[in-house]
Structures are given as C-alpha cells and as structure tokens.
Amino acid sequence: MAKVDQITKKRAMTGNTRSHALNHSRRRWDLNLQKVKIYDENNNIVEVKVTARTLKGLKKNNKVVKVDYSKPAKVYGQNSPK
C-alpha cells in the first residue's frame, strides 16, 4: 500500500495545474506521509505510514510511541534499487 495513509485510507488527489494563460496539464497532490510507531487496540506496537494530519490527532490522543524523522519513509515501487 504505497502512498496511502494506513489509518484513514486517504490517497493522493489528482487534478489540473493551470497557468495564467489557462493552459492545463495533469498533476497529483501527494500526501505528507510519515512513518510512525503507534499502539494498536491490543496495546501492541505497530509501525504504520500516516499523514501529518493524522499524526497530529494521534499525538493529541497519546497513541504515538516514536516518530523517526531521521530517515524518510520508504516508498515502495518507485525508484527502488535493483
């Protein structure tokens, strides 16, 4: 499940980019995904990829164990080493 928030199931949004001359081309707005360790329903620690907005709610409800900002989250299926 690359580029998907694993809690809210949100995906990237698509649309058009418009210039001043009203030219258009297709583009996508990707999510701000962060890899984080959280507690699940059984109080086990699970590593998930969530958006920054979801992470804000998790921090508010004290569900976050650890956020690893030192390494970017792996994006599978895109420019992966062979």
From Swiss-Prot:
GO BP annotation list: translation
GO molecular function: structural constituent of ribosome
Statement: the UniProt record of this protein carries the keyword Nucleotide-binding: no
Keywords from the named record: Ribonucleoprotein, Ribosomal protein
Region annotation (Disordered) ranges: 1-25
GO cellular component: ribonucleoprotein complex; ribosome
UniProt xrefs under InterPro entries: Bacterial_rp_bL28 (IPR050096), Ribosomal_bL28 (IPR026569), Ribosomal_bL28/bL31-like_sf (IPR034704), Ribosomal_bL28_bact-type (IPR001383), Ribosomal_bL28_sf (IPR037147)
Domain of life: Bacteria
Family classification: Belongs to the bacterial ribosomal protein bL28 family.
HAMAP family registered for this protein in UniProt: Ribosomal_bL28
This protein's name: Large ribosomal subunit protein bL28
Annotated organism of origin: Malacoplasma penetrans (strain HF-2) (Mycoplasma penetrans)
Designated gene of the protein: rpmB
